[in-house]
Amino acid sequence: MKKRSRRMQELVGKVEEQLYEPLEAIQLLKQISTAKFIETVEVHCRLGIDPKYNDQQLRATVTLPNGTGQTLRVAVITRGEKINEASTAGADLVGAEELIDEIQNGRLDFDCLIATPDMMPQVAKLGRVLGPRGLMPSPKGGTVTFDLAQAINDFKAGKLEFRNDRTGIVHVLFGKANFSEEALLGNLKAVQEAVDRNRPSGVKGKYWKSIYITSTMSPSIEVDYNLLRDLKLTENT
C-alpha cells in the first residue's frame, strides 16, 4: 500500500467522515486544494447500476453553466463543405479519411471528437483506439451530428460527455479549484441533474449510492445527495 505524504495526511485530517452539505463541501474542497498549480475539480457518482447490462449503462452529456476552466481541443471528421463549416466554427483538427488514418496511427492530440453521420462507417474502425479513451463519437453524446457549428460551440463552452466505468461509477470534472464557490456549486448541480435526467431504464432499486467531490491532489469529500438534489439555485449561480 502506497504511503501517504505528510501533506496528504494533513489534508485527510481536515475532512470528517460525514455527509457534507453541498456548499460546505465545496468550501472545504477549496481550502484543501493547496497544490502549487490550479487543481481540476471532479465529482464521482457511485450509482446502483450493473454495467454488464445494456439497459443499465449511462452515457450522456452535461453542459456546465460556468464552463470547465479548460481549453478544449475539438477534432472533427467530416467531408466536403462541412470541412469549412467546422474550421470556421473553431475546430482544432478537421479532416476526412486522412484524419482517420492519422488517428489510427496514434494521433490523439484532442479532447473531443465529433463526426458527421455519413463518416461513421469509416470512423467505426477506430473503436479500439478511441473506445478505451472515451473519445468514440456517439449520437447519445452529441458527437455524431451534421450541425457541426452548434456541436463545436457547445463543447468549447463547457459541454462534457460522461459515462459509467466498469464498476458503475461516473467521473465528471466540473471546474477548477480557483472557480468561485457559486460557480462550482452551479456546475455540480448541473452534473447531478444530468445524471438523474438520464437514469438508465433498467435500474432497479436505489439509483444513487454516494457522491464525492475531489480535486487533483486532495482527499475526497462526501456530499449529501438529498440536499444537492433539493437545492434550488438562483439564476446567476
Curated annotation (Swiss-Prot):
Quaternary organization: Part of the 50S ribosomal subunit.
Location in or out of the cell: Plastid, Cyanelle
Annotated source species: Cyanophora paradoxa
A Gene Ontology cellular-component term: cyanelle
Main location: plastid
GO BP annotations listed: translation
SUPFAM superfamilies tied to this protein: Ribosomal protein L1
Molecular-function annotations in GO: rRNA binding; structural constituent of ribosome
Keywords: Cyanelle, Plastid, Ribonucleoprotein, Ribosomal protein, RNA-binding, rRNA-binding
Domain of life per record: Eukaryota
Protein name: Large ribosomal subunit protein uL1c
InterPro entries (alphabetical): Ribosom_uL1_bac-type, Ribosomal_uL1, Ribosomal_uL1-like, Ribosomal_uL1/biogenesis, Ribosomal_uL1_3-a/b-sand, Ribosomal_uL1_CS
Gene name in the database record: rpl1
Family: Belongs to the universal ribosomal protein uL1 family.
